[in-house]
Amino acid sequence: MKTKRRAFLQRATGLLGLTGLLSLVETKTGANGLPRKSSKAKKPYVVFVTGDHEYSGELTLPLIAAELEKNYGMRTKVLKSEPDYNGEKDIPGLEALREADLAVFFLRWRQLPQDQLNYIDEYLKSGKPVMGFRTTTHAFNYPDGDSRKAWNAFAEKAFGAPPGWGGAAKHTHYGHNSTTDVTVIPAAASNPILTGVAPSFHVASWLYRVQPDYPPKDATLLLMGKAVNPDKEAIDNPVAWTWKNGWGGRAFITTMGHPEDFQVEAFQRLVVNAIHWELGLPVPKNWKGKLDINVPYGHPKKS
């Protein structure tokens, strides 16, 4: 009797063990035997850091973020200056950069406290990719004597862009009544970031002067801009390039970013492509279609 009972228990234990093993396999592979996809693990996390006085970046970039989540399988978070876009000294939530796979900056003349700068510094030193729009060339504006003044050169260190507005690099633009004709640089025509981007298009952004000192010689220039109706003698200047910064991170920056630029399909595709490239993902071959973006310049008037 004891022998039969022992045999039964052994068979039951074996069956339970097999059931547990099958349960474990199904957890990892799914009932159909194919690998189960972890929705959190597979989705890149893109954090947008916004705060500018002029170009409504806190309104345009959330629309890009929504498109990434809806059609491109990404997770996003948009951080904004407080109490509003004019707030220069507080962008809550920067600790999100610790989990980010890509940090996207659209900043202008911020004076963040050191504890917030530390999150950006930590991110840069991780060697993860960075992306910047327009006024990020002069993201910070600390006065002489401030221990944080070195941050005024953020764009130079992170993107190979001029270290702030004016200065020795004579970083300027060609007037608020000008616009820009943009063309693909022939040598860059096969760059994946330019997949599906029209060979020429027009944007509302007045052209930024970055040459002759920037971008660095080891940058890859993608798009060239020509000022239309400039207020001074103008030279053609690159308006988008990539670079490997000193921390080993991929960098993409564009000096475009006027809210009307976001209505231009070529610009939209440039941005989506660049985000994929930054993350080391294949650039989408199938464009999901033009985004409906209609954000005013200068921020909406408050009621």
Regions found by a protein language model. Give the residues of each.
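N-terminal secretory signal peptides and thylakoid transit peptides that target proteins
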Residues: 1-19
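Non-transmembrane alpha-helical segments in soluble domains
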Residues: 9, 65, 121, 194, ...
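C-terminal segment of N-terminal export signals and the immediately downstream linker at the start
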Residues: 22-46
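Extracellular ligand-binding/catalytic regions of CAZymes and related secreted enzymes
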Residues: 38-44, 70-71, 228-303
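Helical hinge/lid and interdomain linker segments adjacent to catalytic or ligand-binding clefts
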Residues: 47-48, 53-139
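Catalytic beta-strand/loop cores that center a nucleophilic Ser/Cys/Thr
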Residues: 69, 75-77, 85-88, 99, ...
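Oxidoreductase and adenylate-handling cofactor-binding alpha/beta cores
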Residues: 154-155, 203-219, 267-283
